[in-house]
Amino acid sequence: MIFGKYINKYYLKNAPILILGLAALILVDYFQLFIPELYRMVINGMNGDPVLVNGQAAVFDMEFLLDQVCRPMIISIIVMVVGRFLWRVCFFGSAIRVVTDLRTCMFAHSKELSQEYYQVNKVGNLMSLYTNDLDTVQECFGDGILMFCDALFLGLLAVIKMWRMNHFLTGLSMIPMAFLMAAGTTLGKYLMKKWEERQAAFSELSDFAQENYSGLAVIKAFVKETKELMMFRRLNRENEDINVEYTKISTLLNIMVTLFVESVICVILGYGGYLVYCGSFDAGQLVEYIGYFSAVVWPIMAVSMLIEKTSRGKASLNRITELLDAKVDVKDRGGVQDLPSIHGKIEFRNLTFRYPDGEYDVLKNVSFTIEPGESVGIVGKTGSGKTTIVDLLLRTYNVPDGTLFIDDHDVNTVSIHSVREGCAYVPQDNFLFSDTISGNISFAFDDENQEAIEDAAMMSDVHDNIAEFKEGYRTVLGERGVTVSGGQKQRISIARALMKHAPILILDDSVSAVDTKTERTILDNLKKREGLTTILIAHRISTVEQMDKIVFVEDGEVHAVGKHEDLYRTCTAYRKMVDLQKLEEEAGEE
């Protein structure tokens, strides 16, 4: 059995079912210990020794055999079969429900964590929590309760019956048990440590494989298949070595249990045979005693397995607890309210920002205002802080008080949900789900309105491309949209954002993979949306030339804000960037 702050509540939640399973288990144990008494009657009857039933002598004949042996044996077997089915359903069913709830809790908490967490913790490691570690917890919860309760009740009842038959022989039989418990406790701690190492090695292996599958095209392009294979073999060998070491310790524990059991059997046969020889025991009593000890063998084995499973379960639960203990950095403050109907005014007011683990400010005293319905381009060199600006607008990170306002509301005084609900976002990587094109475009809604989907696709100039596909809008995209081109991915992502009909549209370098003609068509279509506040991050100045306003960012600072013509005339750094891009375009044409 395992205990922890995130799993203890499930014992109470499943208490009625667990109690029912426990009752069935005790009933099975009782009838299991009734069977050795039947063995004694049969053997004594066949040997001509007295057959005692409830302390009274009985005649051993066919009627006795049917009434006192066969019928009780059949009833016991039926009760044991039904009881075992019942406790298996109760214990293992509870374990499945516990892991289902725990998995949901983990997923819900994961969704609340900030990007910083996922930058530190790799996807492969997280996936191993949802697979290997949860499977281990499920096994430990279900099997652990079974083994603990069965070892406790069956072992205790059997030892009591053995003690009543002969105190000294029972004392001798229990001596190896003390050594087993001491050895098991020591090995259990070592097993827990090795299981943690095993899970960590498996996580690293899973993450490496996941990263390779995602970057397979790059690996092939650079002809690095052999290098990556050698790396995988090294990680796989490390995983193998840890598993082998864990298996050695686990096997040693099992061998010790077997050794103790066999040694006790030798003691029982030796001293028990002596008692039979002296007349203190008859043959039937010796067989009955061995039958009780046979019932103790399973609890002894269960203790060994329980130590191993508990060690594994604790290690896996510790890893899961680390995830559930991860602090939710970006969350609503107490008493916040939803934004009312958003008009689209955005104001940055002397905003300075540094990433939580950063060593310097990535944004410094950023100030500019976007009026409702304006189209604004944000340009600057790579790493100047353009994407950070929209990350803060989307509340991906915490924003300093009094520095960012939407419709004159400080974003820290309104709910994060309402801020994000009012924004439609097209990220740089243009992530698409492994779903139909229709499903991707209508992602913001629970149902698919085909007319609205096609309207959004037309605005992003991707409708004609989709129509050329054999399945049209029902075409299923591969993982991350690998079955479509880069330009098509961008335009499908734009269509998804447009279909949301949010008052604020954010495009983070989202037309870089399309040609100039397609880019112009998309931007012209965006202007037709009345009241739409558009923020477009771009590297090409030509992309934002026609915007109502351009924000020029350099080294985390806003150097200039205004129309293209004004900036070209008044801002030297902006003019140099424009001239340089024109020279690059002319050189490319030549």
Outline where the language-model segments fall.
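Membrane-integrated ABC transporters
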Residues: 1-35, 47-72, 86-91, 95, ...
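Juxtamembrane loop-to-helix connectors within ABC transporter transmembrane domains
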Residues: 2, 91, 111-156
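Transmembrane helices of ABC transporter permease
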Residues: 13, 17-30, 76-80, 143-197, ...
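An intracellular "coupling" helix at the cytosolic face of ABC transporter transmembrane type-1 domains
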Residues: 13, 115-116, 132-141, 145, ...
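Helix-loop junctions and hydrophobic alpha-helical segments within the transmembrane domains
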Residues: 106, 110, 219, 320, ...
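Conserved catalytic Walker-motif region of ABC-type ATPase nucleotide-binding domains
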Residues: 110, 232, 320, 348-350
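Helix-loop-helix
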Residues: 161-178, 249-318, 324
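ABC-type nucleotide-binding domain
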Residues: 339-590
